């Protein structure tokens, strides 16, 4: 054999021997990248490292794909730390085993002198560890850092129990805590959960509970020899729950609340001889509860829980403790703390709430306290309404011995008083078992306060909700469907809808002056009609502000019944009896306090005067000048008689006073009628007050200039009428020009005539001393002679004119003809379609397709709402007044209107059923 062949054979044999002698992971001469080179290599102390990307906390080899790595085991007497290697791919792991042991699933045999230090990093990927449990006497130090900067550590120390520093152990065993994945919620933005391994007697493998993504679960293990445990808080944005170990022999347990963006609570259990593990209820928003645990014999665990979606508060503010006693005598101690010094109590709803203590077997016992909510509440861990996740606590001493027994247990002490150095304010809340609305709050070290909640009838609450919905819906003038009304009634009371609707109709009729009328019995559509009729001058008849005007009439009536004056406290007491509260912002009335003391006073409906001889200062309300101009005492007296179900003559003195006022008004009206028709409404300026500096003399202004200034003045009055505020003379001159001072009476006369004939309003002097003016609507016909879609803006009211035009044209008019009519009234081209569409949706108009029309055309006719709210005679009178004619000038329409009035009078004698009016 040649020398070359011998050398090549030797090289091949050497490589084969090297492959047989070495492991499968690396070549013979190249060590692994994660294998320590010598004893001083810092990688020995690094422990198990996580890869940069999303990886798994397993024990694989550095090659790709699933693989297994079995590091060498320690022999007897060796003192070598173990190292676990993690690769980048999805791998599986096997725990290190001893070559002399029974199998790969058992912990390695470690002799005396073996010190093991391990740290496990939790990555973002899924983990599948099978941690063994440590036997009795084993000692281990465990550190669990979390990737992305979030670290969680558990340091275990106890006087008589095992020390967690790496020391010499008496028996073989390694305790590896469970790893954490995304599902368990250990991340910067997820749910932060503490989980710890079970320390039991003897070697074995303990598998932790699987944690899903939805429920937040914490599993506290127990130790038979007792542990003193201190857990630092975690930091995250979500729900943070920390569960403590339970011990037997007086452990000193402290758990600070986690610092997350949520509400945190910790509760101390009542002191006793029994073993219990407490789970505190989740506190609602704005409350931070922290109570130090008491120290007596028995197992005591303080478990802080947190609720998310609320800023975290600290315990630096004012704190108090609440000792809640249930019907069975169970009591607890809470200390709510607010960051800004506010003190809050646990929210208690309507109904009874029970508190139960669930006792487990010999190992541990768990008690759960439920949060008081509306209706009967069962015991269990409560959750916040906005967070669907459930907090589940489970405490088990040994997996083989799981015995659960549930019993209702009462605490021995009535309350648990916190330490005085914490500056807690102690209270006791006593709830009457017979009357759930009666609550007594007694301070343990302060004065006693007794509170009795006002009983609320669920039926009345549903009536109030339906009433507000009807009033809001009526402002849009749209028909109200029964299905929409049922949505505002609680599901448990929808079967009593007829009774609730009847009560709401009574309130509408008595207080808000509306009648609930069924428009269509088949489709169950309702509308609101004016029932009590408008006031004489119609100033208070403002449909969009109808509820406010009804409230004003009630106040005016109360002032009238109390001798034309009433104190503010008496008015609030009267309103409270009708369900109107000062502090509550109603959706219909808005801010009631501002409405009374600001808006009605500014609008001169009320006068608000202080009483000088009262300390503190009190105020009295009187009728304002606008109220005296727009209504009468007789009208208000009849209104109050309907509310109190009486007759106006039941108040004889007030009735005689109202009759005298009506007689005076008749004399004044007759005196005005006797005057010339073209009489100036306002006096002319005296000649001696004329100034020669004007460009034109008072009687030498051109007619066009006077008409221009009068139109501008009309625009000002219409603009200010929506605010109901008085218009001073100075403001008028500032708007139209100060050069109009000399011709001011003439301009007022022109503007008053335009407002009276065109817009149906009258210009009056509200305050002669301050020269302030205002508008009010005077309807010369019957009470509801005209209907208006926008009463507060007369310039936008074209409903009565459109209805009259349709009636004059033969009860139907083409769409193009109606638009041409609106264009003649000054309506812009872009708005005519909007106006007619609104009238169609409000059922004032109906559209009928013209047969054989190409392109398609429609005719407008009166709708059902128009036939209910007005009549043909009223429309004919309206047209006659506009054209300065008499209704008889249209003989055909007048005869039809008279027949319609006869039919209405006959229908008024029998019950009216509105059905298919189209």
Curated annotation (Swiss-Prot):
The keyword Membrane applies. Residues 1-140, 154-227, 367-388 are annotated as: Disordered. InterPro entries: MAGE, MAGE_WH1, MAGE_WH2, MHD_dom. Expressed in cell bodies and dendrites of hippocampal and Purkinje neurons. Also expressed in peripheral nerve, where it localizes to the perineurium and myelin (at protein level). Predominantly expressed in brain and at low levels in the heart, liver, kidney, spleen, testis, lung, thymus, placenta and skeletal muscle. The keyword Cytoplasm applies. Residues 704-918 are annotated as: Interaction with DTNA. Residues 459-658, 706-897 form the MAGE domain. Residues 70-96, 113-126, 213-227 have a biased composition (Polar residues). Interacts with DTNA. Interacts with TRIM28. This is Melanoma-associated antigen E1. It comes from Mus musculus (Mouse).
């Amino acid at each position: 054999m040649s020398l070359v062949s011998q050398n090549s054979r030797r090289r091949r044999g050497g490589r084969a021997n090297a492959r047989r002698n070495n492991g499968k992971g690396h070549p013979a001469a190249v060590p692994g990248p994660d294998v320590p080179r010598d004893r001083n290599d810092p990688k020995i102390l690094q422990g198990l490292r996580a890869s940069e990307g999303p990886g798994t906390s397993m024990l694989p080899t550095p090659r790709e794909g699933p693989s297994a790595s079995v590091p060498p085991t320690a022999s007897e007497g060796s003192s070598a730390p173990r190292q676990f290697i993690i690769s980048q791919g999805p791998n599986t792991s096997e725990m290190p085993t001893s070559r002399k042991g029974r199998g790969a699933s058992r912990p390695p045999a470690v002799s005396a002198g073996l010190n093991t230090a391990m740290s496990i990093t939790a990555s973002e990927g899924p983990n599948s560890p099978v941690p063994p449990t440590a036997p009795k006497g084993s000692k281990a130090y465990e550190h669990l850092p979390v990737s992305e900067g979030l670290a969680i550590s558990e340091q275990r120390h106890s006087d008589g129990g095992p020390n967690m520093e790496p020391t010499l152990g008496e028996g073989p065993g390694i305790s590896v805590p469970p790893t954490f994945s995304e599902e368990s919620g250990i991340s910067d933005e997820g749910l932060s959960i503490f989980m710890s391994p079970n320390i039991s007697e003897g070697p074995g493998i303990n598998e932790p509970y699987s944690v899903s993504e939805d429920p937040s679960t914490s599993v506290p293990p127990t130790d038979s020899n007792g542990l003193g445990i201190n857990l630092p808080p975690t930091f995250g944005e979500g729900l943070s729950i920390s569960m403590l170990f339970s011990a037997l022999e007086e452990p000193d347990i402290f758990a600070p609340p986690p610092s997350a963006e949520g509400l945190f609570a910790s509760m101390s259990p009542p002191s006793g001889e029994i073993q219990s593990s407490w789970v505190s209820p989740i506190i609602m928003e704005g409350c931070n509860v922290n109570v130090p645990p008491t120290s007596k014999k028995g197992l005591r665990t303080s478990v802080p829980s947190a609720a998310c979606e609320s800023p975290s508060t600290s315990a630096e503010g004012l704190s108090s403790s609440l000792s809640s006693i249930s019907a069975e005598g169970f009591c607890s101690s809470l200390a709510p703390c607010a960051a800004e010094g506010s003190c809050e109590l646990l929210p208690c709803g309507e109904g009874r709430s029970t508190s139960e203590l669930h006792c487990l077997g010999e190992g541990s016992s768990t008690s759960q306290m439920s949060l008081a909510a509306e209706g009967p509440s069962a015991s269990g861990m409560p959750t916040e309404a906005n967070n669907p996740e459930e907090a589940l606590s489970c405490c088990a001493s040994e997996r083989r011995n799981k015995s659960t027994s549930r019993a209702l247990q009462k605490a021995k002490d009535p309350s648990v008083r916190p330490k005085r150095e914490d500056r807690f304010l102690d209270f006791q809340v006593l709830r009457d078992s017979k009357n759930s609305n009666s609550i007594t709050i007694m301070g343990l070290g302060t004065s006693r306060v007794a509170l009795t909640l006002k009983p609320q009838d669920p039926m009345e609450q549903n009536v109030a909700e339906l009433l507000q919905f009807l009033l809001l819906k009526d402002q849009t003038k749209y028909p109200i469907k029964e299905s929409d009304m049922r949505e505002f009634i609680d599901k448990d009371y929808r079967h009593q809808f007829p009774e609730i609707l009847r009560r709401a109709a009574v309130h509408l009729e008595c207080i808000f002056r509306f009648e609930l009328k069924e428009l269509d019995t088949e489709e169950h559509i309702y509308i609101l009609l004016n029932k009590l009729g408008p006031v004489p001058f119609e100033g208070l008849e403002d449909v969009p502000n109808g509820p406010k005007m009804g409230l004003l009439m009630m106040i005016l009536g109360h002032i009238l019944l109390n001798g034309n004056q009433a104190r503010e406290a008496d008015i609030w007491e009267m309103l409270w009896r009708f369900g109107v509260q000062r502090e509550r912002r109603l959706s219909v009335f808005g801010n009631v306090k501002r409405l009374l003391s600001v808006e009605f006073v500014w609008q001169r409906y009320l006068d608000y005067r202080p009483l000088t001889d009262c300390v503190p200062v009190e105020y009295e309300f009187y009728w304002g000048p606008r109220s005296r101009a727009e209504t009468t005492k007789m009208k208000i007296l009849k209104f109050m008689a309907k509310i109190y179900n009486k007759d106006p003559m039941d108040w004889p003195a007030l009735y005689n006073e109202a009759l005298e006022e009506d007689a005076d008004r008749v004399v004044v009206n007759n005196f005005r009628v006797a005057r010339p028709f073209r009489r100036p409404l306002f006096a002319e300026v005296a000649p001696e007050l004329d100034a020669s500096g004007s460009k034109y003399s008072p009687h030498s202004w051109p007619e066009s200039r006077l008409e221009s200034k009068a139109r501008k003045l009309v625009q000002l009055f219409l603009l200010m009428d929506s605010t109901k505020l008085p218009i001073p003379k100075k403001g008028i001159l500032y708007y139209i020009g100060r050069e109009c001072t000399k011709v001011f009476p003439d301009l007022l006369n022109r503007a008053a005539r335009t407002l009276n004939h065109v817009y149906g309003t009258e210009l009056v002097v509200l305050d002669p001393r301050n020269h302030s003016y205002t508008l009010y609507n005077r309807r010369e016909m019957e009470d509801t002679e005209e209907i208006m879609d926008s009463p507060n803006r007369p310039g936008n009211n074209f409903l009565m004119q459109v209805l009259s035009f349709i009636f004059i044209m033969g009860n139907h008019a083409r769409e193009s003809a109606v638009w041409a009519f609106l264009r003649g009234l000054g309506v812009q081209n872009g708005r005519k379609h909007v106006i007619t569409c609104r009238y169609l949706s409000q059922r004032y108009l109906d559209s009928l397709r013209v047969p054989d029309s190409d392109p398609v055309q429609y005719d407008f006719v009166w709708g059902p709402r128009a036939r209910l709210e007005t009549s043909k005679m009223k429309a004919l009178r309206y047209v006659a007044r506009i054209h300065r004619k008499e209704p008889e000038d249209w003989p055909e329409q007048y005869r039809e209107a008279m027949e319609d009035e006869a039919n209405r009078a006959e229908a008024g004698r029998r019950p009216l059923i509105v059905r298919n009016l189209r």
